[in-house]
Amino acid sequence: MESWPWPSGGAWLLVAARALLQLLRADLRLGRPLLAALALLAALDWLCQRLLPPLAALAVLAATGWIVLSRLARPQRLPVATRAVLITGCDSGFGNATAKKLDAMGFTVLATVLDLNSPGALELRACCSSRLQLLQMDLTKPADISRVLEFTKVHTASTGLWGLVNNAGQNIFVADAELCPVATFRTCMEVNFFGALEMTKGLLPLLRRSSGRIVTVSSPAGDMPFPCLAAYGTSKAALALLMGNFSCELLPWGVKVSIILPACFKTESVKDVHQWEERKQQLLATLPQELLQAYGEDYIEHLNGQFLHSLSQALPDLSPVVDAITDALLAAQPRRRYYPGHGLGLIYFIHYYLPEGCGRVSCSPSSSVPMCQEHYRLPAWPYLCPGHSPGPRPQTGPLSHCPVSRAHVEQLQQRRFLVPLLFFQVF
């Protein structure tokens, strides 16, 4: 212990020197975060004294202090000046809120909407400055995309285009992959992937010229399997991988690419319960009889109820997502990935660090909708259906035909399990 003071003091000296330099540059956030960081370093110092040799302790303390102070640095922002940004999907939600904020900051905003007479478009026209331009565009129509690209090139000829925000997205059904029509997968890919790809490729000449930014709103459903979001998640997974490629390939041009992965937020689409009910009825009406008999209408009804319950817990304040998009556009060194909202850390921890079985239990529909093994295709869970024994079972009849299982499902529905907390914002 006698040799300890020099590494401990040396580490604190390095931390103090870094903090002093940041203070002189007005580049250090003061207050509770700084106090918490100092408390963390003090606790780490105490542990290192007892567990590590001096040189290792010096390295650990100095590295931790450097990282912590880097996180406490005030983010350096670029001036707005006359920068122009194009945002897709501004009828409502994140796109609408981002367009309003960027316009208020002084950006020249090109906002695309599905309908120029939609409530969101009329709101933007009423509350924003004359710099904001509303453009009608359907990402599934190449003619619309070509028209918007041409308008953007002409409109930004003098100022240049600084940023593209790929925000537009679509999810149609909440159901197992087998239940979703193939057309649903194609539609999600057209809007969420190919639409963003066409917009990005079409505007890259302008973005390379300005060394600008590409910001894409994706979803955690593209990073890991989420129950009943196969079509949407598949398209977002492809989109995230594409943006990862762009991020590497555009580095020589100075173009920075960021992905936004929001938690569950209460956008206009989420709040429209009538829309989800219509889509559920549409799915039930179009399902082949064989699938409807194998899965049962009760299963789809329960999934829809769980989904709506999870959306009722969505975060009402969209500002974390809007702030993340703004930071990705203006930060001198934007992050590659932003995770606005609460609860994401736990989900990613379960998926990436816990045993694979934990992720399957938490993300499987079977964890929220136990089914009688005589009627359903899930693994045999005799303790969920006490009236039946394990073993092979025919795929016949809906769950309502089994009174024991029906009562058990109703009992388990009241517990709600984890799945309502695992559904994420999907727009």
From Swiss-Prot:
Record SUPFAM superfamilies: NAD(P)-binding Rossmann-fold domains
The entry lists its GO molecular-function terms as:
11-beta-hydroxysteroid dehydrogenase (NAD+) activity
The similarity annotation says: Belongs to the short-chain dehydrogenases/reductases (SDR) family.
Supply the name of the protein: 11-beta-hydroxysteroid dehydrogenase type 2
How activity is controlled: the entry says: Inhibited by glycyrrhetinic acid, carbenoloxone, 11-alpha-OH-progesterone and 11-beta-OH-progesterone.
Recorded catalytic reaction(s): these are: an 11beta-hydroxysteroid + NAD(+) = an 11-oxosteroid + NADH + H(+); corticosterone + NAD(+) = 11-dehydrocorticosterone + NADH + H(+); cortisol + NAD(+) = cortisone + NADH + H(+); 11beta,17beta-dihydroxyandrost-4-ene-3-one + NAD(+) = 17beta-hydroxyandrost-4-ene-3,11-dione + NADH + H(+)
- One Pfam family recorded for the sequence: adh_short
The enzyme's E.C. designation: 1.1.1.-
Q: Where does the chain bind NAD(+)? A: 82-111
Starting at the broadest rank, the lineage of the source organism is: Eukaryota, Metazoa, Chordata, Craniata, Vertebrata
Originating gene: HSD11B2
Residues annotated as transmembrane: none
